[in-house]
Amino acid sequence: MTEDIIKERLLFLKPTQFNLENESELHRGHKGNSGGEHFNLYIVSEFFEGKNTMERHRIIYNALESLIPKKIHALSLKTFAPKEL
């Protein structure tokens, strides 16, 4: 499953919190959907300490690059360092 691949690819971040929700059912039949799935990701990692939002998102998108757009059509990210909670 795509969820398992995403989790595996992001293990290097050693997240202390990780919540991945597949919301594809909410988007079935929408115009422009290439068949990939829609995900919301909430992740907390010390790896994000000192990095801004754009840098954090770039790290995640680079790790998942080969899954976009075939397996992942949309990905909403909420990224935090532990000290921000």
Question: Over which residues does each language-model region extend?
Answer:
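N-terminal, polar/charged subdomain of small-to-medium soluble alpha/beta proteins
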Residues: 1-85
